[in-house]
Design a protein with these regions (language model features):
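N-terminal intrinsically disordered/low-complexity leader segments
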Residues: 1-35, 171, 219-230
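Hydrophobic alpha-helical segments that form the core
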Residues: 2-6, 13, 170-191, 202-214
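Generic hydrophobic, amphipathic alpha-helix propensity
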Residues: 36-44, 61, 86-90, 94-98, ...
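Helix-turn-helix
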Residues: 39, 43, 47-81, 85
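Short coil/turn segments at alpha/beta junctions that flank glycine-rich nucleotide-binding fingerprints
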Residues: 50-54, 125, 167
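Hydrophobic alpha-helical connector segments
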Residues: 85, 99-124, 178-181, 204
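Amphipathic alpha-helical packing segments from all-alpha helical-bundle domains
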Residues: 92-95, 141-165, 175-180, 202-205, ...
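Amphipathic alpha-helical segments used for helix-helix packing
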Residues: 121-143, 157-161, 187-194
Length: 230
């Protein structure tokens, strides 16, 4: 079901029932269906980030929400459905943050905007990023972190294409270079998530430093130094 109903039929026993566990459910607050759905999404997001998909159970999500398991099934059909919605939301949030940051300006400014937006997402939506970078069977159906990075790279591709043309490089190579740049930022973000230093703005500045000055020193027809042609 889509969770449009309230909690009157959510599978709870009356508060006076001796069979109802005291922990988590004693002070349950009544919510509308929409409020309960959002609560379950928030809790599910936190638990999935903490334990991963396989380590998360419907029982724990229900326990933390102070509801019975049937409530989770009513709103999402089960753990897989809840996880899919969480992943979809996080993917859209990250994509919106990056594309929304590209407000125009010089190519370097656009590169800075994209790099900082990704670092900002990692900083402000840490649980979401942890979920996205983990592999799970469900993520394969709803979209993977790799596919999301590819979507972001498509945005960067337009920036590089213009820059390549201005510098006399083959603009057809822009898609490959955009994958390289975005992949570099994403992997650096995963590293920064663990160490949390230096500050995100400084990390973004170093990323842009490497990327931008690397572009400045590019050769039009690069070749390997060694004899590795195949």
């Amino acid at each position: 079901m889509n969770g449009s109903n309230g909690d009157s039929a959510d599978g709870h026993r009356p508060a006076s029932s001796s069979a109802a566990p005291a922990r988590g459910r004693a002070g349950r607050v009544r919510m509308t269906g929409k409020q309960r759905r959002e609560q379950l999404l928030d809790i599910g997001r936190s638990v999935f980030a903490e334990r991963g998909y396989d380590g998360t159970s419907v029982e724990e999500i229900a326990e933390r929400a102070g509801v019975s398991k049937p409530v989770v099934y009513e709103h999402f059909g089960g753990k897989e459905g809840l996880y899919a919605v969480v992943v979809d939301r996080e993917m859209q949030l990250l994509l919106d943050m990056v594309t929304g940051a590209l407000t125009g300006g010089h190519s370097r400014e656009l590169l800075e905007q994209a790099a900082f937006a990704l670092m900002d997402y990692i900083d402000t939506s840490t649980d979401g990023f942890k979920i996205l970078v983990r592999d799970s069977p469900v993520a394969q159906a709803t979209g993977t972190f790799a596919s999301l990075i590819s979507d972001i790279a498509t945005q960067v591709e337009d920036i590089l294409g213009l820059e390549f043309k201005a510098r006399g490089f083959d603009a057809r190579l822009a898609p490959m270079y955009s994958q390289m740049l975005v992949g570099m930022v994403a992997l650096t973000g995963q590293w920064w998530l663990e160490v949390r230093k230096p500050q995100k703005a400084e990390v973004a500045a170093h990323l842009v430093n490497l990327a931008w000055h690397g572009l400045e020193g590019m050769e039009r027809h690069p070749k390997l130094v060694g004899d590795r042609q195949n």
